[in-house]
Amino acid sequence: MATYKPLEYLEHLKKIVPDLSDQINNIKDTYENKLWHQLTKQIEMIIISPQLLEKKELFNFYTNFIRDFENKLRPLSLVEICIAVARQFDTDESRKFIETISQKVKKDKSAYILTLSYIANMNLRSGVAEQLQDCKKTLELAKEELQGVTGLDTIVYSSFYRVSTDYHMAKSQASEFYKNALMYLSYCKLETISQEEQASLAYNLCIAALVGENVYGFGDLIANPILKALEGSQHNWLIAFLKAFNIGDIQQFEGLMSQHRDIISTQTAITNNMQKLRQKISILSLLELAFRTPSDKRSISFSKIAQATKLPLGEIEHLLMKSLSLNLIKGSIDQTVEIIHITWVTPRILDLNQINSMNNRIAEWTEKAKTSLRLVEDDTVDLVA
């Protein structure tokens, strides 16, 4: 491969892609004037041009031109440019190229973490078991770099959480997949994700929410516009499932199971976890009961819980012990009289019905406070008299 000095290469490049001559001339002028920020923007534009991509000239563009002044560029911008270059290689070459860039930008948090995320992604895409382990190690390193750091560029967070999402998907780790996928969605614009990918991600999120060991909050997902990708599709039933679980509505859950039994029978993630699903919705039913019960009346009988959860009375203590061990509620069980005294319920994102319920309870509390105030005022008047 021939090598050129920067300006010589630009002249050579104009012969390869004559349609881009004007852009290349502008780049030449900006380079000669050492306007590095403006040059960065021009490079970002030209490297996505179909003509340059078709000629597979990006690596030569980097080697013969960009590398001459790469230390003048903002490190994160350099990494983004190099990632565009790396996409023209196969997975292994792409990873090795970004590994060399990673060492050059190691002192810059944003740039370094972005390279780590890309390297982890290439390890994941290789499909080789050993490199899957390398993916994990690289993600752990990136996570360490993120600890205690705020205010990094959005692309740094979105790239990290996207690769983490894909990794946990590959490892069938539902709870971690759910957590990382929601973080990814919080840092990326939905319109940048294709409709097909949105539908796939929404489906996998719903399944992960339902079967994930430690997932007992569905409000984040229900409120996320990603679920619109399932509306009108064959997986639309999952939205109704989530909403039933979110409020612990066992009757609605049973109805949906019956209504959609044919398609549910094809969902092995659901059918293989039916016992866990029934336990989860029972716990969520308990949480809903506790949430709707005023805090000064949260001494709840086993029989009332059995009625709400549709469980036999003999299974209630086990349900309560499970909920306490998961730190979803705090309190104490009085086995003698079969009552639990709940002192705390895990916070969660509320739907409109739950918000209305809380509003009603606040209104009731306000009236009680007003009544108490009036009684105090009346007693004060009597004392003064």
Curated annotation (Swiss-Prot):
GO terms for biological process: ubiquitin-dependent protein catabolic process. One of its GO terms (cellular component) is cytosol. The keyword RNA-binding does not apply. Keywords: Proteasome. GO terms for molecular function: structural molecule activity. The keyword Cell inner membrane does not apply. PROSITE patterns: PCI. Residues 176-347 form the PCI domain. Acts as a regulatory subunit of the 26S proteasome which is involved in the ATP-dependent degradation of ubiquitinated proteins. This is 26S proteasome non-ATPase regulatory subunit 13. It comes from Dictyostelium discoideum.
